[in-house]
Amino acid sequence: MCLLFNRVVDMENPERHTVYLVVSLFVTFLSNKNSTPTDEKANAKKQSLVFRHFNTLLGYSSTEKCFTIPPARLRKAAVCNAFISGLPEILDMNLHTGNQLLPTVAQLLIHLPSPQKLASDQNVTNYSLALLTQHTRHLWLQSLILILYKYRFDQLPVSEYIVRLIGIVVKTLQNQVHECSDAADQSAEIDTWDEIEDDDVARAELIRPESLTVTTIQEATPAAEGMVHIGAVCVMQPTIVEPEGLAPEPLIARKRSTAVQEVRRKKSAIEVVKKSCTLRCGHCNEAIEMFDEETISLCLIALETFLHREPSMAAPILFKILYTVTRLIDTPMYPWHSTEMFVPANSRSVAKQMLRVSLHHLSTSAICLQLFDTKIPRPDAFWSVVALSLADFPELSPVYFIQILMEDLEESWPGSVKLIMKNLAFYIVEIPTDMYNNPWKDLVGHLETFFKRYHSAISADNGITPTRAEIENVIIVMTHVFKVQTFSSSKSPVTLVEAFARWLSESLHSADVSLESLLGVCTACNRALIRERDKQCITRALVTELMQAIKFKVKLHESNYVTIANMILQDAGEDIEVPLLDDQFNTAASEAIRPFLFEVLDFIADLHVIAKLKKESNSDALGGDLKVKLAEAIAVEMSRSNARDCRTVIRFIPWLMSPPSVTQAAPSAFADSVTNVRVLSWLLLGALHANHSCLPVPIECSQHMADYIHFVLAGFADQSKQSVVHMSALFHAFHLCQLWTVYCERAATYSSTTAFAHLVDFWARVTPAILQLLSHSKVLADMVNLHFLNTIQALQQVNSALLCQLYSMWAPILTAYHSQIPNQLRMKLDSCQNQPSLEAPLVTEWLKKVRYKISQVELQTSAASPYYTV
């Protein structure tokens, strides 16, 4: 055998068939179990010598432990092809010989598909099997699978070789489902035809049948034979040779040599054309490679075998493997791949089986926790494929996969669950809620334990507070769990809801939550449970947290105050400024706030709450926005009764029915009246923000409203210097007049026929009090004139019908103290008279301005009250 190998030392031996047969005979010999040498040293020495000769023939240097022949040349060698053809049989049939050849075989498998040009070039680590022919690829993969299945590879240097081989397999699968890399050079340029050298064009010229010419053989110099000169370019013109009679033997040999050279030229031209016509990605300019289904299936089998044999070695590239497999499943090669049917020998079916078997095998090694705690590109597609693969796998159902995650979290709680919740939200929405009834029931208990642990983690002194995205993802998870058909029949659904509600209430302290998320989870809970009290568990927890926040016992995130208030108004059927894609929500929040309505009234009446909220949130608008939202909720509740009497007024604001008398007022009556005027202003603001049918204060109470304003105006001259609160009484009284006017006019438009008459009577009672206030002093008259002119301007902005009727009566008020209207007021009055509105007025814009003014006055009054006392 050694002598035979010595005869075959030329890699480009013309007798390639003979070389192939010789090596095939040697491979057949090695695959025979009886070829294993005995214990005799002589036979072992001879076999070692044979292997050394064969390694030399393959171009492998035993001293340098590397190949000295370029991969491209080795791929064409008959010796290599013959050896690769029988390599799987050797590895399968003769383990003793396979173990001896294993290091060399592993290096050969690494070197063979390499794209490096020279053997001395630096080894490339990121390449696929694209350079191998289809048949060679199959043999290559079969050999690798046998090594992974039958041989030990946990020791150096074989372990390093195996890792590199697995990298080649992974790269092959990645190239099959090409994905542009972020690190790819987007400015990569594709060579144009003008940049290709002329000699390359000549060698790459396509051979067409119509370009062939029939010539006779003539005596010619080899240099000129078959050459056509076109300018400076020498182009080879193929010829078909027809002999003329008999030719001498040297001429026949020369013809044979010419024919061989012609075939080589054609093959070289075809290879150049293939390289020039590579299919590339239009975005990143990387080559796009396509492989047959058997190659892909063999790659998947090799990866699964590797994961099963040595999971510790696969750990560094485990996610890359799983992600690539999911990309294969998500990218069908043929139309029938898109169906859910399991097709044997189908690469997509093999990939699904490989994915779920791998996850099941590694489920006891905390693979769930590691996978969910990994940043995944395109997580929606990834988790959709995982759920699809586990759908018909009894050993590991999609729901049981989540249960394993919960068990892993119970054993080892991570520093942050933000990424886990994000991936879990993408995964759980892919699981149907009408299947896997028993696994869903088992999961409820684990989720309860999870939220108890989660609540303890974020409520600790040094705990990591959840972000908005984290809260939103948890809400998505729980909303989907609530939609499970058998949720109410689980072992402890109520305790899970309570644990989640406590966590959600605590989370609202640190991050904002969207209104739609809160509406969705509260509605899902309302529909999932059976008992009425249990249905409102989450809603009641949110409303209670808001009530604790307005008492300043807890601190919510700035935007969550208004968000929870909007949730209450939405449930009451009111229009809110937040756009909602779906309005089919039922949270029962308007019912949950009913026990706290009197506490809400106290919050509205408190002069200092806006200043306190500003300190917590650094926002001037938060206090006013929250007050008007809660005032709207009270107004809606007060107007819910269909009775035309004043029973709701007596229940909520009984002091309105008994205004103080000017002659028999207590010392604190003026301060209380100013507070009541502010409360009435906020209630009317809330009612005007609500729908048209919202009338919390009956129109018949117009007389009592006028009596309160009359009392404040009558006592302002004497009480205004007592405190800062008293100083703002005039401002609040005139704004209440404006709001009551707009309130009555809207009622006259939509519901009440007597509203306008009551409004005229209201101003008939208030106007004398204004005239009486003008008689005190010039300074006070200027203040009253300014407020009264602001009232006229405000009524003009809302296009008040009352202004047209009473303006002639009001004009003398402006000159009651002065002989004529002062200049600073004249300009403002002229602007009102000379600029009539040509468009329909927007009452909402005016309400926003009034709301802002009232809140700013309360803020300034609260800030100045500690420093101004008499």
Curated annotation (Swiss-Prot):
Natural source organism: Caenorhabditis elegans
Encoding gene, per UniProt annotation: unc-79
Protein name in UniProt: Uncoordinated protein 79
GO terms under cellular component: axon
GO annotation (BP), single: response to ethanol
Family annotation (InterPro entries): UNC79
